[in-house]
Amino acid sequence: MVQQQQQSQQRMMELHERNDREKLARKTEKEREEERRKQEDDKILQLEKKLEEFQENARFIGDLASNFQTKYQDALNGRIYTLVRGLQDLDRMKGTFSDKKVPLDLLPYLDDGKNPCLYSKHCMEKTLEKNKAVNGKIEIYKKFRAHLMKEFSEEMPDLVMYYRSIREDLDLS
C-alpha cells in the first residue's frame, strides 16, 4: 500500500515536471515569436528611415538643381553622392524583404500621393460587390431549381419522388 502511494506520488511529480517543461517551452516559443515580430518591425522602421532620407535628398537635389548656382556645386555633388549611397543601401536591404509581396496595383495610388489604406479599402469594396453578384446568382439558381422541381413534380410526380428519395439532402424551400 505504501509502495503504491509512493509510486502514485512519483507519477504526480513527473506529471507536474512535464507540465512545467511544456509551459516553459510554450513561453519561450511565445518569446521567440515576439522577438521575430520585433525584428520585423525594426527592419520596416529602418526601411522607412532610409526611404525618408532618400526622399529628402531627392527633394533637396531638385531644389538645388532648379535654382542652380555654381557656388552650390559642391553641395549638389554631395547630395548626389548621398543619394547614390542611399540607393546602394536600399539595394542591400532588398534581400531582407524578399518574402514581402506588394501588389502592383498599389503603385499608382502611391504615385498619386494617396494613402495605401485607400487601396485596401477599394479592394475590399470590389470584393464585396463581387460577393453580392455571386450570391445573387446563387439565389437565382436556387429559385430556378425550386421552380423546376415544382414544375417537374406536376408533370412527372413519380420521377420527382424517385429523385427526391435519392437526393435526401435536397432543400426546395
Swiss-Prot record:
Residues 13-42 have a biased composition (Basic and acidic residues). Keywords: Activator, Nucleus, Transcription, Transcription regulation. It is found in: Nucleus. Signal peptide: none annotated. Residues 1-42 are annotated as: Disordered. One of its GO terms (cellular component) is mediator complex. Residues 1-10 have a biased composition (Low complexity). It holds the Pfam family Med10. GO terms for biological process: regulation of transcription by RNA polymerase II. Component of the Mediator complex. Component of the Mediator complex, a coactivator involved in the regulated transcription of nearly all RNA polymerase II-dependent genes. Mediator functions as a bridge to convey information from gene-specific regulatory proteins to the basal RNA polymerase II transcription machinery. Mediator is recruited to promoters by direct interactions with regulatory proteins and serves as a scaffold for the assembly of a functional preinitiation complex with RNA polymerase II and the general transcription factors. Belongs to the Mediator complex subunit 10 family. This is Mediator of RNA polymerase II transcription subunit 10. The gene is mdt-10.
